[in-house]
Amino acid sequence: LQGFICVIGVLELPVFVTLRPGFWQFSPMRTRRSATEQLPADELFRSRLENQIDLRHPLVQLSHRLPWSALEQALSPRLPATTGTGGRPALPVRLIAGLLYLKHAYDLSDEAVCERWLENPYWQFFTGEVVFQTCVPCDPSSLTRWRQRLGEAGMEELLAHTINTAHAIKAVDARELSRVIVDTTVQEKAIAHPTDSRLLEVARKKLVLLAKRHGIALRQTYARQGPALRRKAGRYAHARQFKRMRKVLRRQRTLLGRGLRDLQRKLAQQEPSVRERISVWLERAQRLLAQRPKDKQKLYALHAPEVECMSKGKARQPYEFGVKVGIAVSARKGLIVGARSFPGNPYDGDTLAEQLEQARGLLQDVDVIPQVAIVDLGYRGRDVEGVQILHRGQAKTLTRRQWRWIKRRQAVEPVIGHLKQDCRLNRCHLKGTQGDALHVLGCAAGYNLRWLLRWIACLRAWLQVVRARSSTPSSTMWPANMALEV
């Protein structure tokens, strides 16, 4: 025992602390104990959440059916190890996983999901709280660090456990999960629409800011002429005076080149650490200065060089700027069984093997292997070993049953639409290629959560109808020839 004095008011009380064996050794990441372990069965002044809310609510029912303990065991190896005195314990895994589920299921930002959690007792119950909390669960920036800790494999676990839950409650069976529909779409990045005049002006401002931050005096910053040229280029483009617009763009390139060369000359006198920090932006500015409208692999955003330009043939939006993502859904009920990003804008057929490999990994807990993949003509010319590929280009060899499955191919389109409008897939705010990969997996997990909530609500409504029908004579309420539908 090691003792010390604790001063409480004017009293000095000896306090004894027992150091457990291995106190200073490294151990797996410590997490805060769950609310059920910290609080007694009941309190005098605070009522438990289960006594205040409707336990038949779909979110409450789903919280009882999600395998939280299995999810914690799957995510624990991916969390960093800490020492016994590593500061405050980390937040519970269930709390973070629940917030990530709710964020994408209800189309909210990190800040908004924490604020809504504070107001909603059902959300607090879903994340494992026992009594109503009156402070936010965590700082919104903690969700960013947790996403980085989990990585792509951890986010895949969140998606896989929604599939396991759907199979466990018999919302889908194994035979339905063996047939999947695969399609690709574009996950747009949170950038402004790229125009030459805007990009050149942004690069000039960035170089001036870097020089000022590190105490480098440039000969000229063009603080007045740069914004004026950008506005002038926009007016000329709107008036379709393209010859004048191109003249303004040449002038903007001249100003950017002058500032770039001036900064490069004076950077040689700086410390190596300063040169290393600025060299990244100098390379991007040089790349922007050299590119032309017809070039390939252009730079579309100074802060996001991974952004690519893709054309999907949409009349209202000919070009989209982001990354290609693949979506795999069950052929009959539309449950997402695979979602991943494909940097580099590859041919759709070249993504099929990787997409089905991911789906196979996500379905391994339910002991299902995708056997049939229904695709569009963009996947022609590619085969995957062990999987039957169906598309309408095989018209002469298809059976009538296979044609019926091909007619289900367009069922993936509304799933993609709901992913974009309801689950935040239409705009990715996360940084880099890793952010693109994490975001699409979070959107898919949020969509599956909405799918499960909808299934539970429909089941409850169906049971209410059956109960009402059994308690009411069929001759008075239900005609004999009326089918029971939900």
Predicted features, each with a name:
Residues 2-77, 452-486:
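Charged, often Cys/His-bearing segments associated with DNA-binding zinc-finger transcription factors
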Residues 17, 130-306:
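Active-site- or DNA-interface-adjacent structural scaffold in DNA-acting proteins
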Residues 30-32, 74, 78-97, 104-170:
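Basic, low-complexity intrinsically disordered segments
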Residues 51, 67, 87-95, 135-138, ...:
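Secondary-structure capping and boundary motifs in well-ordered enzyme cores
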Residues 57, 97-99, 113-117, 137-143, ...:
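Short, conserved catalytic/metal-binding motifs centered on acidic residues
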Residues 301-320:
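Flexible, glycine/threonine-enriched loop-and-boundary segments that flank and lead into catalytic domains
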Residues 314-362:
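Electropositive, glycine- and tryptophan-enriched low-complexity nucleic-acid-binding patches
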Residues 364-438:
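Helix-centered, glycine/charged polyanion-binding patches within enzymatic domains
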